[in-house]
């Protein structure tokens, strides 16, 4: 009787009645003698998401090694309730206890691995699958596809998917959602078309929802409209998740009018819909409209839709557009509404003040957080670097490690950037060691930051060693190394690397060409620089020269002493020269004691607005040419107008 009642409670997820039955069983001492009863109680608590109670009952099961069902239930409960580490630990304990996993064990432990991005553990479990009777099981193989796709191991996901003897809708959707998470839009569209062509399956609601991340991140308006049309034809467009997804795609595709039209349709919106509309306005630099939507949430019956995400988005908009008073108002609302106790909101407020430049407020908010996490520290470390307080980031980095909080990639990137700003080789080398020990040294972004740090600390050989040992290079990797060769005066090495880059099939971008022009300038490679700029102007690299490229060419000519040619180059620019271009030329006039040309350039600079830089450079140019009266006259003008040079200081670690 009790077993049938328990079965009813499990099916209806009636926790209260189930606990009453459990109490009766305890009073009659029936639970200790029956593993069947204990397994069903574990099922009850697991189905009701009462994970701790489920584990307590699970631990009472006698001879658990003969009953794999209980292990499966417990692993599933952990994996489904964000206790991924415990699910993985229990799986290994299951193996050590001599219990053979079933086909229901693997999908949930792989789900835990995907949540933890535990690639090594997942690959080990894959080997266990291959040694079991479930290597071709569709349910298990789909879980493997989902694991590899979510972890970014897309080639392995394709391999497992292609080797599946039979694929259902769930397997196709796992591929689509996994590739979509990594913004592989072309692959997502291809899979969407192939599922019908190859296996005769029509995309369902889950397929469409899985496509939205790739469509949104790519800003794919044309494809987004096509998917919207498909949803309308198939009757999916009335689904709330689909409406919100389409809204988000339009907003991220810079088509905010269409996004607003979807938002204004008569349907019951949830908190995700409101947040998507606010985020769309913020992303499209329409902070006023974002504020209006946020206010609309507060004054109508939608106040329950206000979430930490919505508060974070509106604060992000205030930070981006320098609206300190608006951000403070949102901060006050968060305090009054009780959101200030939410760690996500607290971290967002720190990030807002840090991005705005109000580090005092950021530190004050940081000090008020009781239990800080890695995001709390990351927000402040990044803020310190951005606001020219890089030395503070070292203290915070040390503090978080002593507090038992493990730094992540964002932390390390912030600290390495601080090391670059200060040329702090000691701190940078220590951070490099931490990256190696904890497995971050294979990350492309970390390697790029390490190269930048070593380059600016004068250790070009170490930077090159990092570059040579990288598993995967992106365009930033090449650009960083090119800039490194350039600032160290190794123009020929930079040109050689540039050629190697093209030979490997990597197309240069505007930053690449800026780096190679800068390298030519610092090495006096005038002819090579001219040839490169002419190729760029002809469109050989599909990059249009911008003001920075013209500034580099001006510096190249002026630094080599071709002042008249540089001046002629500046006058023939397709747009008005800015203060940087003219400052570069004026600095060269000082170096080569060309007071006449310096005077002409100074007049152009002053037409853009008088600056301390232009007057100081002109005064120095006159002094270098021994025109002391003119130099004194410029100094007097500078003094009368209050354009005084601010004394500065700098330091490096030795």
Curated annotation (Swiss-Prot):
Keywords: Repeat
Ranges for the PPR repeats: 1-32, 34-64, 67-101, 102-136, 137-171, 172-203, 204-238, 239-269, 270-304, 307-341, 342-372, 373-407, 408-442, 443-473, 474-508, 509-543, 546-576
Family indicated by similarity: Belongs to the PPR family. PCMP-E subfamily.
UniProt name for this protein: Pentatricopeptide repeat-containing protein At3g16610
Organism name: Arabidopsis thaliana (Mouse-ear cress)
Biological processes annotated in GO: RNA modification
Keyword Nucleus tagged: no
PROSITE patterns reported in the protein's UniProt record: PPR
GO MF, any single term: RNA binding
Renumbered residue ranges of the record's region Type E motif: 581-654
Presence of the UniProt keyword Repeat in the record: yes
């Amino acid at each position: 009787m009790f077993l049938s009642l328990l079965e009813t409670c499990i099916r209806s997820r009636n926790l209260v009645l189930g606990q009453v039955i459990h109490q009766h069983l305890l009073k009659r001492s029936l639970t200790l003698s029956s593993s069947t009863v204990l397994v069903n109680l574990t099922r009850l608590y697991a189905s009701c998401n009462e994970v701790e109670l489920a584990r307590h009952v699970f631990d009472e099961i006698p001879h658990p090694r003969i009953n794999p069902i209980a292990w499966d239930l417990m692993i599933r409960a952990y994996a489904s309730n964000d206790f991924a580490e415990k699910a993985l630990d229990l799986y290994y304990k299951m193996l050590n206890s001599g219990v053979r996993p079933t086909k229901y064990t693997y999908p949930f432990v792989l789900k835990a691995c995907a949540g933890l991005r535990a690639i090594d553990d997942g690959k080990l479990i894959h080997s266990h699958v291959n040694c079991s009777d479930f290597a071709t099981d569709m349910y298990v193989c789909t879980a493997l596809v989902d694991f590899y796709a979510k972890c970014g191991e897309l080639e392995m996901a394709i391999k497992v998917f292609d080797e599946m003897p039979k694929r259902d809708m769930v397997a196709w959707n796992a591929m689509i959602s996994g590739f979509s998470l990594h913004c592989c839009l072309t692959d997502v569209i291809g899979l969407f078309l192939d599922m019908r062509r190859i296996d005769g399956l029509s995309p369902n609601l889950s397929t469409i929802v899985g496509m939205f991340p790739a469509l949104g991140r790519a800003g794919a308006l044309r494809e987004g409209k096509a998917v919207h049309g498909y949803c309308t034809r198939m009757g999916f467009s009335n689904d709330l998740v689909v409406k919100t997804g389409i809204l988000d795609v339009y907003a991220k595709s810079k088509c905010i009018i269409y996004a607003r039209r979807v938002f204004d349709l008569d349907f019951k919106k949830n908190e995700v819909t409101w947040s998507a509309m606010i985020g769309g306005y913020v992303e499209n630099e329409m902070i006023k409209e974002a504020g209006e939507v946020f206010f609309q949430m507060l004054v109508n019956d939608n106040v329950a839709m206000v979430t930490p995400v919505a508060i974070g988005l509106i604060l992000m908009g205030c930070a981006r557009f320098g609206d300190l008073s608006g951000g403070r108002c949102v901060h006050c609302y968060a305090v009054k509404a009780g959101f200030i106790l939410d760690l996500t909101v607290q971290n967002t407020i720190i990030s807002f003040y840090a991005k705005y430049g109000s580090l005092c407020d950021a530190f004050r908010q940081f000090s008020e957080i009781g239990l800080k996490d890695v995001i709390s520290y990351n927000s402040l470390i990044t803020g310190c670097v951005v606001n020219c307080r890089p030395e503070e980031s070292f203290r915070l980095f040390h503090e978080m490690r002593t507090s038992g909080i493990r730094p992540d990639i964002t932390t390390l990137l912030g600290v390495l950037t601080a090391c670059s700003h200060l040329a702090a080789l000691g701190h940078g080398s220590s951070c490099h060691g931490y990256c190696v020990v904890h497995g971050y040294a294979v990350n492309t972004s970390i390697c790029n930051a390490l190269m930048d740090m070593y380059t600016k600390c004068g250790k070009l050989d170490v930077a090159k060693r990092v570059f040579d040992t990288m598993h995967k290079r992106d365009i930033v990797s090449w650009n960083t190394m090119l800039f490194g060769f350039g600032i160290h005066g190794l123009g020929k090495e930079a040109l050689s690397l540039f050629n190697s880059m093209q030979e490997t099939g990597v197309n240069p971008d505007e930053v690449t060409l800026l780096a190679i022009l800068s390298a030519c300038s610092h090495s006096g490679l005038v002819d090579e620089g001219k040839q490169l700029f002419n190729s760029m102007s002809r469109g050989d690299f599909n990059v249009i020269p911008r003001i920075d490229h013209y500034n580099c060419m001006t510096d190249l000519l002026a630094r080599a002493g071709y002042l008249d040619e540089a001046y002629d180059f500046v006058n023939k620019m397709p747009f008005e020269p800015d203060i940087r271009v003219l400052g570069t030329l004026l600095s060269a006039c000082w170096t080569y004691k060309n007071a006449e040309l310096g005077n002409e350039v100074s007049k152009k600079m002053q037409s853009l607005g008088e600056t301390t830089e232009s007057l100081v450079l002109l005064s120095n140019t006159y002094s270098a040419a021994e025109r002391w009266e003119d130099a004194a006259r410029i100094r007097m003008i500078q003094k009368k107008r209050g354009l005084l040079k601010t004394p500065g200081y700098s330091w490096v670690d030795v």
